[in-house]
Amino acid sequence: MTKYFGTDGVRGIANKELSPEMAFRLGRTGGYVLTQHKEDASRRPLVLVARDTRISGQMLADALIAGLLSVGIEVLDLGVITTPAVAYLIKIQGADAGIQISASHNPVADNGIKFFGADGYKLSDDTEEEIEALLDAPEDKLPRPAAEGLGTVDDYPEGALKYTQFLEQTLADDLSGIHVCLDGANGATSGLVSRIFADLETDFDTMAISPDGLNINANVGSTHPQALSKFVVEKGADVGLAFDGDGDRCIAVDEQGNIVDGDKIMFILGSYMKSQGRLKQDTVVTTVMSNLGLYKALEANGMKSVQTAVGDRHVVEAMRKDGYNIGGEQSGHVILFDYHNTGDGMLTGIHLLNVMKKTGKKLSELAAPVQDYPQKLVNVKVADKENWQAYPEIQSAIDTVEKEMAGDGRVLVRPSGTEPLLRVMAEAKTEDLVSRYVDQIVDVVKQEMGSKED
């Protein structure tokens, strides 16, 4: 069976791999599968559809919606809105599913189609495979109703207001007295940030909130926070917040222009939650890519951590399974389960500002306990990435390095999820040490697996 779904929905270059024809088929198959499980059989199935600001978004949305309508599904078109807004509104509207058309932080030529179930969570592997089986079927045997059996579509701009009200209501007090610079990445947050931060009574300046269909994520946003860093210093602001194209990430900048990544944000929010007696099991959930500096800071401040595989989906799964209420990734996906079930950049941002206001501390002071260890990552081309652990010499090289580190560094070796690469990463006290450690392991990988560096 063809694997259409990646770690975050179906992605590709818009109008090529991700064509309008594919979007139509995803509407039919995905809509059909997701609405077969609805609890109330007496009403028509309802699906929410939204998109980010990419030029290809309208084309793919129209094709996707046509597919949904063709199997008798009612559609609420939310227009341009963030991914976490879709996840929230599914539950508020009592919808059977939600679909976001976005490639998140990727370049403008890319796009993606991301599905959420009736519970507002991303789909399980089993559900994705059910959709993939229908996509691969030699013949489309899904229903083709006529006349009154067809679905209808309604625009629903009110969704944005409901979502912004939800965000504002997660705070007990306003954020007056804070001067913040906001970078909308020319993406889905562009039309929302001014409303929210005005309602919360901040003093704010904005950049990258004028999308033209082509400038999403272009040298701005959470993957390029350097522009915001300069903007914060120019404006003399207390803090800057950079979002990504679909609004599920947030990277901050302190008053000196220093970047405060997802690791530091999780530490700041987790520490404050602990001080308020709200950090469940005194634990923060991270992925294996979080910096050793975060783990050292958590331990020094009486907190524990749980590590998952890379991807916010794995973080959410661990949080649901064991009852934790904060987790995330270095990239700025932060999940605050007390309020929402998915990463939400604006939710993260306003709660970071709330900690600044409640503690009276500057962001640089709040982030200071997390001292990043120098990190080096080398990708090595290999023929059989999944079986690297079968080579005892590689494991021996890792053991030797870890013994030298004596707890003051770490090694992570893992296969790439999409390419024939083995990723060798290490963190240590100094740049020289980390380079030596990585090179030691990479040399053995090349020797044992007959590979060459990409």
UniProtKB/Swiss-Prot annotation:
<dbReference type="GO" id="GO:0009252">
    <property type="term" value="P:peptidoglycan biosynthetic process"/>
</dbReference>
<feature type="active site" description="Phosphoserine intermediate">
    <location>
        <position position="104"/>
    </location>
</feature>
<dbReference type="InterPro" id="IPR016055">
    <property type="entry name" value="A-D-PHexomutase_a/b/a-I/II/III"/>
</dbReference>
<dbReference type="Pfam" id="PF02879">
    <property type="entry name" value="PGM_PMM_II"/>
</dbReference>
<keyword id="KW-0460">Magnesium</keyword>
<dbReference type="InterPro" id="IPR005841">
    <property type="entry name" value="Alpha-D-phosphohexomutase_SF"/>
</dbReference>
<keyword id="KW-0597">Phosphoprotein</keyword>
<comment type="function">
    <text>Catalyzes the conversion of glucosamine-6-phosphate to glucosamine-1-phosphate.</text>
</comment>
<keyword id="KW-0413">Isomerase</keyword>
<dbReference type="GO" id="GO:0006048">
    <property type="term" value="P:UDP-N-acetylglucosamine biosynthetic process"/>
</dbReference>
<dbReference type="InterPro" id="IPR005844">
    <property type="entry name" value="A-D-PHexomutase_a/b/a-I"/>
</dbReference>
<dbReference type="GO" id="GO:0004615">
    <property type="term" value="F:phosphomannomutase activity"/>
</dbReference>
<dbReference type="GO" id="GO:0000287">
    <property type="term" value="F:magnesium ion binding"/>
</dbReference>
<dbReference type="InterPro" id="IPR016066">
    <property type="entry name" value="A-D-PHexomutase_CS"/>
</dbReference>
<dbReference type="Pfam" id="PF00408">
    <property type="entry name" value="PGM_PMM_IV"/>
</dbReference>
<feature type="binding site" description="via phosphate group">
    <location>
        <position position="104"/>
    </location>
    <ligand>
        <name>Mg(2+)</name>
    </ligand>
</feature>
<feature type="binding site">
    <location>
        <position position="248"/>
    </location>
    <ligand>
        <name>Mg(2+)</name>
    </ligand>
</feature>
<dbReference type="InterPro" id="IPR005846">
    <property type="entry name" value="A-D-PHexomutase_a/b/a-III"/>
</dbReference>
<dbReference type="InterPro" id="IPR006352">
    <property type="entry name" value="GlmM_bact"/>
</dbReference>
<protein>
    <recommendedName>
        <fullName>Phosphoglucosamine mutase</fullName>
        <ecNumber>5.4.2.10</ecNumber>
    </recommendedName>
</protein>
<dbReference type="GO" id="GO:0005829">
    <property type="term" value="C:cytosol"/>
</dbReference>
<dbReference type="InterPro" id="IPR005843">
    <property type="entry name" value="A-D-PHexomutase_C"/>
</dbReference>
<comment type="similarity">
    <text>Belongs to the phosphohexose mutase family.</text>
</comment>
<dbReference type="InterPro" id="IPR050060">
    <property type="entry name" value="Phosphoglucosamine_mutase"/>
</dbReference>
<feature type="binding site">
    <location>
        <position position="246"/>
    </location>
    <ligand>
        <name>Mg(2+)</name>
    </ligand>
</feature>
<dbReference type="Pfam" id="PF02880">
    <property type="entry name" value="PGM_PMM_III"/>
</dbReference>
<dbReference type="InterPro" id="IPR036900">
    <property type="entry name" value="A-D-PHexomutase_C_sf"/>
</dbReference>
<dbReference type="InterPro" id="IPR005845">
    <property type="entry name" value="A-D-PHexomutase_a/b/a-II"/>
</dbReference>
<keyword id="KW-0479">Metal-binding</keyword>
<dbReference type="GO" id="GO:0005975">
    <property type="term" value="P:carbohydrate metabolic process"/>
</dbReference>
<dbReference type="GO" id="GO:0008966">
    <property type="term" value="F:phosphoglucosamine mutase activity"/>
</dbReference>
<feature type="binding site">
    <location>
        <position position="244"/>
    </location>
    <ligand>
        <name>Mg(2+)</name>
    </ligand>
</feature>
<feature type="modified residue" description="Phosphoserine">
    <location>
        <position position="104"/>
    </location>
</feature>
<dbReference type="Pfam" id="PF02878">
    <property type="entry name" value="PGM_PMM_I"/>
</dbReference>
